[in-house]
């Protein structure tokens, strides 16, 4: 039976550092808001960050391979394709390196630095999230506002202009 690798919950995560083929990415969580610290300081995409954090908190080890002289290259772990560092609210840190998928592509090889064993992780969701491009972790909002604060909207397109105002009934928009 697969067992949980790390003994923390998603809510305990304060920071995630991710190194993949894209480079280094650093994400920090303050209450419920994610912020990108590296490669640039910017607001982060909540869904992408929550997904990665959830995968890290719930990742399970399907089986463990322990041999006296492990050839890490055979598992894509020398060097590792992906390196993750998780910092918890209490200050504790956890690290994980991800390598290749197994022959069935349903599991991924991994290791905790300093441990002389290959972990076979039960899911490749973590690998998929950790392989995302930096842009996928950035907030893509063009304008930020609370929906109930919006009273009117003007849309200008070439030779046409559209004006909308909120009516008496909430969510009822009428052309001006």
Range-by-range predicted roles:
Residues 1-176:
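A short-motif feature that recognizes glycine-rich, charge-decorated loops
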């Amino acid at each position: 039976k697969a067992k949980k690798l790390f003994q923390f919950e998603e809510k305990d995560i304060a920071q995630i550092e991710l190194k993949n083929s894209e480079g280094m990415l650093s994400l920090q969580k303050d209450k419920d808001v994610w912020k990108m610290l590296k490669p640039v300081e910017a607001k982060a995409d909540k869904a992408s960050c929550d997904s990665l954090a959830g995968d890290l908190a719930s990742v399970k080890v399907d089986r463990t391979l322990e041999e006296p002289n492990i050839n890490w290259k055979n598992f894509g772990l020398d060097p590792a394709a992906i390196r993750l560092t998780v910092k918890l609210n209490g200050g504790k840190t956890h690290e994980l390196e991800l390598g290749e998928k197994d022959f069935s592509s349903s599991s991924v090889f991994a290791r905790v630095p300093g441990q002389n064993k290959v972990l076979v992780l039960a899911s490749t969701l973590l690998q998929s999230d950790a392989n995302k491009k930096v842009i996928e972790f950035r907030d893509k909002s063009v304008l930020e506002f609370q929906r109930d604060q919006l009273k009117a909207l003007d849309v200008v397109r070439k030779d046409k202009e559209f004006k909308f105002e909120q009516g008496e009934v909430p969510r009822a928009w009428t052309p001006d």
